[in-house]
Amino acid sequence: NFFYYNKTKQISPLEFVHQTTPPENYKSPINRFTLIANWTIRCIDITKQAYDYPETMIIIEDYSFGSKGKIFELAENCGIMKYMLEVENYKYQKIAPTTLKKYATSSGRSNKDDMYDKFFEETQLKLKETFSKKKIKISSPVSDLVDSYYLCKYLVFPPE
């Protein structure tokens, strides 16, 4: 999920990223993570050129230690991404999920619904209706888009 800080000082989604798709044909999970990392680097490169930014700032949500599910695959994916960023000389910073939640909602214990409500209050974008019409609970990709919005906002407008 890609957002950028535009010249009118607003956080905007990158439209061209939505016109490209990450790779779907892969041989193994590690191959998939490598293809996704390469696609991400390509998107960052295109953004840097398209918007003529002298410096690219990247922020990544760090691991959540209470995560359930495919935590090892997530770690492998993130490790490959960080490695590729370093190979391409892109600097990045990490932010803890609780720090991001506190920044967005004033509470580090907020849930996905709280994050979405705050996002909607700020942007008036109805992501839930667009991406998960049948679902009542907030889930991917809606929660991922909300998180990426607040990651960008945190980078551009850090807390004092």
Identify the function of each model-found stretch:
Residues 1-160:
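Phosphate- and other anionic-substrate recognition elements at nucleic-acid/protein interfaces
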